[in-house]
Amino acid sequence: ERLEALIAIEHDDHATAAAIRAADPPPWLRIIPAPPGGPRTKPRAMNHALDLARGEIVGIYDAEDRPDPGQIRRAAAIFAKAPPRLACLQARLAFHNTADGWLPRCFAIEYIQWFHLVLPAMRRMGFPIPLGGTSLFFRRRALERLGAWDAWNVTEDADLGLRLARAGYETGLVDSDTQEEAVSRPLAWIRQRSRWQKGYLHTWMTHMRRPVRLWRGLG
């Protein structure tokens, strides 16, 4: 096996590190604490982990994700047959806790239409794919060429999807599902969506600084 798994955590998250070690992880799994400093964000932690990763294909999962068992092999097989311009693959996201109430069920309906209808249509029409933040696979060379993730953007996935398209890369879709846990409380939903809107605004302001260049880059 050529699998390597890096768990990116903050440098002072001792409880998570202890829980992982107590679970007796396999030798191909390593804990990667982000160095002290800011911002304390997921993209900053991923940038640090990328520097220590050894693989040519880089996959991203959130801590609660439950991907299909064959998802990684399927993504690797697609990359092996595809031209280098295919730099990213997005798997579908779904939720395993729809029985927890009305809000998770609404999430599930939203994601079904997004991953089964909207993204495939955008792919067919040649539009940039707004990435989902998890269950993503990248060619490492393309990721490093673009400078990896923007550590200050809380929707680093949306920003990276646009940067991939502007650089001439393509994003494909993997016929595979990852089960996630949807937020089930209204306040948590408000915080999550507020963070997303903040990140989308950040992304829009970043890429619209030179709208003509953006238009030309996206073709």
Please report, for each region that a protein language model flagged, where it lies by residue:
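Hydrophobic targeting segments
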Residues: E1-I9, I31
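Acidic metal-phosphate-binding loop of nucleotide-sugar-dependent transferases
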Residues: D13, Y61, D65-P67, L93
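Acidic donor-binding loop at a coil-to-helix junction in glycosyltransferase catalytic cores
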Residues: V154-L160
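A short, conserved beta-strand element in the Rossmann-like catalytic core
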Residues: R66-P67, A94-H96, D159, Q179-E180
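Catalytic donor-sugar/metal-binding loop of nucleotide-sugar-dependent glycosyltransferases
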Residues: G161-Q179
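Long helical/loop segments within the catalytic core of UDP-sugar-dependent glycosyltransferases
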Residues: A22-G55, P69-V154, P186, I190, ...
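Short aromatic/hydrophobic "clamp" motif used to bind/position activated sugar donors
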Residues: V58
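A conserved acidic beta->alpha catalytic loop
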Residues: I9-A18, P36-P39, R66
